[in-house]
From Swiss-Prot:
Biased composition (Basic residues): 1-14
Segments for region (Disordered): 1-31
Cytoplasmic topological domain: 68-71, 143-163, 212-246, 303-326
All ranges on the Extracellular side of the membrane: 1-46, 93-121, 185-190, 268-281
Species the sequence originates in: Danio rerio
Location within or outside the cell: Cell membrane
Function: Receptor specific to the heptapeptide core common to adrenocorticotropic hormone and alpha-, beta-, and gamma-MSH. Plays a central role in energy homeostasis and somatic growth. This receptor is mediated by G proteins that stimulate adenylate cyclase (cAMP).
Keywords: Cell membrane, Disulfide bond, G-protein coupled receptor, Glycoprotein, Lipoprotein, Membrane, Palmitate, Receptor, Transducer, Transmembrane, Transmembrane helix
GN (gene name): mc4r
Residues of this chain annotated as glycosylated in UniProt: 2, 15, 94, 108
Covalently attached lipid (S-palmitoyl cysteine), positions: 316
Protein's recorded name: Melanocortin receptor 4
Annotated Gene Ontology cellular component terms: cytoplasm; plasma membrane
Family affiliation: Belongs to the G-protein coupled receptor 1 family.
Length: 326
């Protein structure tokens, strides 16, 4: 986001933090232990590249598994696929922007202001759009799990595959437009406040859904258990799905919260020494964001036997080990 005369998500926040050094405090050029807190934490390009590549492969595997396995052709997994696409774009965009900046710094790429600005705007728009898509996809999954538990007998009439596809299309259309607008007007404090407000509003909404879900789930499961057939088994599977999504939400909050705290401090106390010290670790917060994209596919694999089975089949086919796929 372009919050200073330097462009790009990485450089704008780094330079904003450095430019906000309190008067009388040592800058990055001064010696002494105190100055270390105000220097931007440097992380090698190789780490960004590695995380980006791992996330790319993992999330492609998730998307391929959902497309390949017809048992995974359900609204919840379609929303998970949307989340995987968002995770993939976040990591790839972060890694790509880091590589471009490294090439420019090393003199291996044309250092023209207009070209750099346009490239950074594209990368930043992708990152911002993907962030919004992640939040909305998580909310869609939460609503889907809520319906399966509290409206179990009407679920297939309420949440059809066609309706899920329409929801995903609306999510990505809205998030793409919003992401571009956020970057175009990112120099405005109002835009940052809107982004922060959206993040916490969506988290509060999802938290309220899950609290209500788990508080009343046991009572509802007892009612379903009284019905003939596979009601109890199906309900238990739905609860397992709800727990999986709760884990995803928890990981999302842990990985993204430092970034949004950085934004809050950047707006509220840009010259406070403690705030500046926190903001100096911006690169670490980018790493946490990319780690979220790496962790999510592992959660899918750990929590879903069907996903693990499909992952194994795809990996075996990739390596030509067809006999092991049986």
């Amino acid at each position: 986001m372009n919050t200073s005369h330097h462009h790009g998500l990485h450089h704008s926040f780094r330079n904003h933090s450095q430019g906000a050094l309190p008067v009388g405090k040592p800058s990055h050029g001064d010696r002494g232990s105190a100055s270390g807190c105000y220097e931007q934490l440097l992380i090698s390009t190789e780490i960004f590249l590695t995380l980006g590549l791992v996330s790319l492969l993992e999330n492609i595997l998730v998307i391929a598994a959902i497309v390949k396995n017809k048992n995974l052709h359900s609204p919840m997994y379609f929303f998970i696929c949307s989340l995987a696409v968002a995770d993939l774009l976040v990591s790839v965009s972060n890694a790509s922007e880091t590589v471009v900046m490294a090439l420019i710094t090393g003199g291996n790429l044309t250092n023209r202001e207009s070209i750099i600005k346009n490239m950074d705007n594209v990368f930043d728009s992708m990152i911002c759009s993907s962030l919004l898509a992640s939040i909305w996809s998580l909310l869609a999954i939460a609503v889907d799990r809520y319906i399966t538990i509290f409206y179990a007998l009407r679920y297939h009439n309420i949440m059809t595959q066609r309706r899920a596809g329409t929801i995903i299309t609306c999510i990505w259309t809205f998030c793409t437009v919003s992401g571009v607008l956020f970057i175009v007007y990112s120099e405005s404090t109002t835009v940052l406040i809107c982004l922060i407000s959206m993040f916490f509003t969506m988290l509060a909404l999802m938290a309220s859904l899950y609290v209500h879900m788990f508080l009343l789930a046991r009572l509802h499961m007892k009612r379903i258990a009284a019905l003939p057939g596979n009601g109890p088994i199906w309900q238990a599977a739905n609860m397992k799905g709800a727990i999986t999504i709760t884990i995803l939400l928890g990981v999302f909050v842990v990985c993204w919260a430092p970034f949004f705290l950085h934004l809050i401090l950047m707006i509220s106390c840009p010259r406070n020494p403690y705030c500046v010290c926190f903001m100096s670790h911006f690169n670490m917060y980018l790493i946490l964001i990319m780690c979220n994209s790496v962790i999510d596919p592992l959660i899918y694999a750990f929590r879903s036997q069907e996903m693990r089975k499909t992952f194994k089949e795809i990996c075996c086919c990739w390596y030509g080990l067809a006999s092991l796929c049986v």
